[in-house]
């Protein structure tokens, strides 16, 4: 029976060593991030929501890089107002570079005034540029360095989603951000593809 207890002890030690470091400063981002390769259309497939009113589903983002290397983005998606009024709304973001090519300051605002605006950190946690991307932002940190108010998007180039292999990578990144099981699936049902012009703001 001693070997059984030894295995139990090893498992306990392994669990303790594997305890996740949830301080924001410990999170890894994409090495040698390339803005030009990242540009183009991305479909939001899952989202960890922050505080405030943001786009809720049917979210499509378009990233671009100008001749000076500055990145910007536009996004369209559905928002529900007053619990029963669905509208399509646009948001705009501009990015300021930092010393790390995968970490930006993002100034964003809604074309409609009811949407949130701010100037948040915007980190590209991981991407292969052709299939998936995981974005993260911490808007407010606790005293211990963990995040008190964060949001995160999982983006795809294909609105139909990922292969099982990519899903496994994405789940791992979500766990590394201490956000496992905190994302909700983003639907894409064509609500904002031009069929509902009367409800576009």
UniProtKB/Swiss-Prot annotation:
Omega-N-methylarginine modification, residue list: 139
Family stated for the protein in its record: Belongs to the calycin superfamily. Lipocalin family.
Signal sequence region: 1-18
GO CC terms in record: extracellular space
Chief subcellular location: secreted
Residue positions binding substrate: 116
Gene: RBP4
Biological process per Gene Ontology, one example term: retinol transport
Function per UniProt: Retinol-binding protein that mediates retinol transport in blood plasma. Delivers retinol from the liver stores to the peripheral tissues. Transfers the bound all-trans retinol to STRA6, that then facilitates retinol transport across the cell membrane.
Disulfide bond annotation, renumbered to this chain: 22-178, 88-192, 138-147
Record's keyword terms, sorted: Disulfide bond, Methylation, Retinol-binding, Secreted, Signal, Transport, Vitamin A
GO molecular function: retinal binding; retinol binding; retinol transmembrane transporter activity
Subunit field text: Interacts with TTR. Interaction with TTR prevents its loss by filtration through the kidney glomeruli. Interacts with STRA6.
PANTHER family in alphabetical order: RETINOL-BINDING PROTEIN 4
InterPro entries for the chain: Calycin (IPR012674), Lipocalin_ApoD (IPR022271), Lipocalin_CS (IPR022272), Lipocln_cytosolic_FA-bd_dom (IPR000566), Retinol-bd/Purpurin (IPR002449)
Protein's cellular compartments: Secreted
PROSITE patterns membership: LIPOCALIN (PS00213)
Pfam families in the cross-refs: Lipocalin
Protein name: Retinol-binding protein 4
């Amino acid at each position: 029976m001693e070997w059984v207890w030894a295995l139990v002890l090893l498992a306990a030690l392994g669990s303790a060593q594997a305890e996740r470091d949830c301080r924001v400063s410990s999170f890894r981002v994409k090495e040698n991030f390339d803005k030009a390769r990242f540009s183009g259309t991305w479909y939001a497939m899952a989202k960890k929501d922050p505080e405030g009113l943001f786009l809720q589903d049917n979210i499509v983002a378009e990233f671009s890089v100008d001749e000076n290397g500055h990145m910007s983005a536009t996004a369209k998606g559905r928002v529900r107002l007053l619990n029963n009024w669905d509208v399509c709304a646009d948001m705009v973001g501009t990015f300021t570079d930092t010393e790390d090519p995968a970490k930006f300051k993002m100034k964003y605002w809604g074309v409609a005034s009811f949407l949130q605006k701010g100037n948040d950190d915007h980190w590209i946690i991981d991407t292969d540029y052709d299939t998936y991307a995981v974005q993260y932002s911490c808007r407010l940190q606790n005293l211990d360095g963990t995040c008190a108010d964060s949001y995160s998007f999982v983006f795809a180039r294909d609105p139909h989603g990922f292969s099982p292999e990519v899903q496994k990578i994405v789940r791992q990144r979500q766990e590394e951000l201490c956000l496992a099981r905190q994302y909700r699936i983003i639907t894409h049902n064509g609500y904002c593809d031009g069929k509902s012009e009367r409800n576009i703001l």
